[in-house]
């Protein structure tokens, strides 16, 4: 039953308060102002005092305006017609296409029963050596991409969306600059991936509260497709904007702040979204990659700090590259023993030598004498960074492993690598150029 009220008790920021009965948490309402109407959601219940956040903002809203409660929580249409479409944070078309009102599903439900989950066991190939070789992305994994403003994290998401071997991409943007939104849209269209992509976007020009629904709507749709047997990759950017929106609402609601003004339930709110990652027995899966920008490159900032306790590793994007030392995929050992017998050896050896090369780079910068071993390490460092770490590199895993052997053979002798003899005999390039 729809209930209509015509008296607003208070207006604070994007939050209005009314006195109403029989209202449930999360229920939607329509706020009808003089010249417009806007969707609102119940975010707090205090007996008969009901607080709602207005998605379109409260500009132009007066205390005498009408509030019509709809009797249900946020819903979104679910069907194959979503593919190739672009929507806003409320599920309304943003691409000029028709509205979709059939087969509505509620968003923001609980995570799947743990007994329905299976142990992660399949690799997701991305064509990026720094992921596929060194920190393999595993189906049903949840990983953040830690970065700072100015790094090409959205460009990285575009490459993953274009190259990842999955059935479906769901892209959720929060606080996107309009140029970034157009970059996503144009790149996916040119790359031919828009037909397998669903885009839910909130731009920096939209009401800040609308960004709160983007992860929930993206993950709810992903779950339905996963239950239909689809391998779904959810790409979210930027979870710090999502947390900042929660912070703004909590301040408006005069809640007791926690670390740096964020709400006390920040960890729970983030975990609730990340725990949607799952591999269903006999069905599909949901894998989550979420950009999390770190203000001031501070990993102790509440958003990345809490995220690190929830997820199964992280990718660090620094200097336009995925940093090998800070990045970690905790589930990579579940799959990299099943790819090729030299995978783990190449991974360990190349990272070990690259770490050693950093000492040689410092020695050269400080003017110390360079040994022949230092010269080899410097050559190796340059080749590793240009051929492996560059984000423009797009090669299959097997070619990346072969490339690893070529780089090693170009810089070192077999003995200098410390690799076992049986693998040397099997994979070492015939022409040694060390």
Swiss-Prot record:
A GO MF label: ATP binding
Keywords, sorted A to Z: ATP synthesis, Hydrogen ion transport, Ion transport, Transport
Signal peptide interval: none
Pfam families: ATP-synt_ab, ATP-synt_ab_N, ATP-synt_VA_C
The UniProt record lists the keyword DNA damage: no
Residue ranges crossing the lipid bilayer per the database entry: none
UniProt GO BP: proton motive force-driven plasma membrane ATP synthesis
Membrane is among the record's keywords: no
Family annotation (InterPro entries): ATP-synt_VA_C (IPR055190), ATPase_F1/V1/A1_a/bsu_N (IPR004100), ATPase_F1/V1/A1_a/bsu_nucl-bd (IPR000194), P-loop_NTPase (IPR027417), V-ATPase_su_B/beta (IPR022879)
Function, as annotated: Produces ATP from ADP in the presence of a proton gradient across the membrane. The V-type beta chain is a regulatory subunit.
Family: Belongs to the ATPase alpha/beta chains family.
HAMAP family the UniProt entry points to: ATP_synth_B_arch
Protein name: V-type ATP synthase beta chain
